[in-house]
Amino acid sequence: MPETYALFDTTEGKFKAKLYADKAPKTVENFVTLANGTKTGKPFYDGLVFHRVIPNFMIQGGCPEGSGRGGPGYMFADEFHPSLKHDKVGLLSMANSGPNTNGSQFFITVAETSWLDRKHAIFGEIVEGYDIVQKIANSPRDSSDRPKKEVKINSVAIEQV
């Protein structure tokens, strides 16, 4: 089975995530089809922003409104693998508003966040460019944790090797 990677190009630099297609197949399929545009007719994440950044916690993106309230127009069920825990930095996980409300929003941890286990589906981890993720997390932000200077996702390319 080929390994799947997501290559993030942002206004702050590039980073790469390995996607866990073997442990979270539905979640990875959703992310990949949004990223490459097969679900929406155009690459969904291109041009969106990281709308929430919290040092020592996470960075969050994937909202088409840039507010944290938007999504792709559908929701799907949680997918938890018993071996995946929020026990390290650099994990790629689905943001949601409760059980089975996953859509397009995701976050990347910059701390151990074990209280999120079995609440947010982990579907990958950063394998290159974690310093860029950390830089985004440490961006100056307003009282709503929104970066004062917009941090844009220029593109998310999917690579299979």
Where are these regions (language model features)?
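Cyclophilin-like peptidyl-prolyl cis-trans isomerases
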Residues: 1-161
